[in-house]
Regions:
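N-terminal non-catalytic cap/leader segment that marks the start of a structured domain
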Residues: 3-10, 16-98, 194-196, 202-204, ...
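Catalytic-pocket segment enriched in acidic/His residues
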Residues: 8, 162-275
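A generic local secondary-structure boundary/capping motif
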Residues: 68-70, 89-91, 115-124, 138-145, ...
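Residue-level recognition of short, solvent-exposed, well-ordered loop/turn junctions
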Residues: 74, 125-127, 236, 253-254
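RNA pseudouridine synthases
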Residues: 84, 127, 131-156
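A short secondary-structure junction signal
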Residues: 91, 112-114, 141-146, 164-169, ...
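Structural signature of FAD isoalloxazine-binding scaffolds in flavoprotein oxidoreductases
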Residues: 94-111, 126, 259-263
Length: 275
């Protein structure tokens, strides 16, 4: 069954690839309906089902302005990595192995959704990141197998409450520091066929660039971190891997607008609100 799913998803992506070799997939709401689609300019070609399960164009076309884009996938697992750019380490030595952690699936939100600050939070930061979307079941994968198992990539924001992460009020695990509701913005599209090893990542806060670095400067590249994870946790189609944030980060406040802009993918935009 898994093999059929992988083959179907791959064939759909290949069929929908544009002249530049890329395909952009979305999940969207139109009225009360939620559906999957392929984005082509300002139009969304509706699919018969989930693009990860081989959904194909069903003949219905929507104008992009007439639909609400949602988080493009609903992952069964969210894996993330800490300290994966030297620019984010400060004076700390680079890790000897990928330092992975979980984010709960309830933290996922989509483009233009609000990042809602918990009432007792005091120091919530943005973390713009490239996110890999898994396309096939991976267990004990080699780096080459892990690379082949990536369906596509999207933008993510690993929103983090620093006091709960490492301050006086820190928890044993980062369940609320990085997993509170809306702390996992994702989207706006999943792009296939893109060389994600050297993409420029920029984060803007209220229009000002606050993070800017190429994914070529990851300490552990995407296949390496996925292969490492698969030694211990089986990855399934639709799971996502946040690949780390560069540089320094700052506190967000209600009313702020944060944008994660990755070359070849697009812009993930969210407004910050209080609960």
């Amino acid at each position: 069954m898994t093999r059929r799913t992988v083959l179907g998803a791959a064939s759909t992506a290949m069929a929908l690839q544009a002249q530049n070799g890329l395909a952009k997939f979305v999940r969207f709401r139109k009225g009360a309906r939620i559906a999957y689609g392929a984005l082509n300019g300002e139009e969304v070609r509706e699919l018969s089902g989930d693009f990860l399960k081989g959904g194909k164009p069903n003949g219905t076309v929507h104008k992009l302005k007439d639909v609400k884009l949602l988080a493009p996938v609903l992952p069964g697992k969210i894996i993330a990595i800490a300290r994966n750019y030297k620019s984010h380490l400060g004076t700390v030595a680079p890790p000897s192995r990928p330092e992975m952690f979980y984010k709960p699936t309830a933290c996922i939100c989509g483009p233009e959704d609000a990042i809602v600050l918990p009432k007792d939070s005091t120091d919530v930061h943005y973390e713009g990141e490239l996110v890999a979307v898994i396309g096939k079941k991976l267990k004990n994968a080699t780096a080459a197998e892990a690379a082949a198992g990536v369906f596509g990539v999207t933008c993510g924001n690993d929103v983090s409450e620093r006091q709960w992460q490492g301050g006086p009020d820190k928890d044993i695990q980062w369940w609320r520091a990085k997993g509170s509701d809306t702390f996992g913005p994702l989207g706006p599209v999943v792009v296939t066929g893109l060389d994600y090893s050297k993409l420029m990542l920029r984060t803007r806060l209220n229009g000002k660039v606050v993070q800017e670095q190429s994914t070529s400067e990851l300490i552990f590249d995407v296949p390496t971190m996925i292969a490492f994870t698969s030694k211990y946790v089986t990855l399934e189609p639709g799971d996502v891997v946040y690949t780390g944030t560069p540089g320094t980060t700052k506190k967000m406040s209600p009313g702020d607008v944060v944008e994660v802009d990755i070359e070849g993918i697009g812009v993930l935009r969210n407004r910050v609100t209080s609960s």
